Amino acid sequence: MDNNKSNHNSKINSFKGHKVLVIGDTHDSPNIPKDRFLWIGKHIKKIKPDYVVHIGDFSSFDSLSYFQANDTQQGKLKDAFMVDILSMRTALALINKGMGNVQVPKHITLGNHEQRVHKFEEKIPEIEGMMKDQLYQSFHSSNWTVSEYGSIFFVSGVGFTHVPKNIMGKEYGGRNAEISIANDCLHDLVFGHTHKDRDWKAPKIGDKQFVRIVNVGCALPMNHVERYAKLNMTGWSYGIVELSIWDNHIQEKNFVSMDRLEREYGKN
């Protein structure tokens, strides 16, 4: 018997890492196709990760957008809040449908678009808690746990958040956001928000010391650009991300495009 082969197999069987499927910003809304949520659920069923993490901005909540005032022409065309909530619940149900009987812990790190619910309620004290209750109950009833916008959720030493904030309480951004985050962060971090798939590994002084920052892109329909970004530079990345984590670091990363998800699951 090959002892080296036996030892190798023993190491594989005793692997204590975690496989995490990360879903980037999905920006669900009543007018955007929802079949992608079913595809994502089917992919979860296929690969059976240890965790599923949605990086936030599950829904756009354009009904609460403060960029279009209610007394403007565009503002008058906005959907009601409950229309957005019912749309989100349909999307959540499609993920569960695709997963079938596979049971995987699911967590969402709320994004700035979910934060719109908080900001709207703050202006109307009489309805405090009512809209947030609709938001949180939608996730809890579909078996998702939730962390607040700006907080960091950890899996095996790796942090997950919609977008990290700097010392001034502002979101990291710009052309070199990942580099800036790596300079300031003490652990590997996974985030979204910019809709761009980027991966930066920064070496640190010391034996085997480094920080890896992964931006997961977005999970919108392929080549869809949100209305607010029509005239902006985009270069968005459309897909979901598989991560393998051990030794408190992201060791492997695989980006699965929305095109591939559609080819594999779209006609099943």
Functional labels for PLM-detected ranges:
Residues 1-16, 20, 151-179:
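Core dinuclear metal-dependent hydrolase active-site scaffold
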Residues 220, 254-267:
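Short, solvent-exposed aromatic-acidic interface loops
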Residues 32-34, 62-66, 117-122, 171-173, ...:
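A short acidic (Asp/Glu
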Residues 64-149:
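Active-site neighborhood of divalent metal-dependent phosphoester bond hydrolases
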Residues 24-28, 56-60, 112-114, 163-165, ...:
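Active-site metal-binding loops of divalent metal-dependent hydrolases
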Residues 161-254:
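Conserved beta-sheet core of the metallophosphoesterase superfamily
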Residues 52, 106-108, 213:
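Hydrophobic/aromatic residues located in beta-strands of well-ordered beta-sheets
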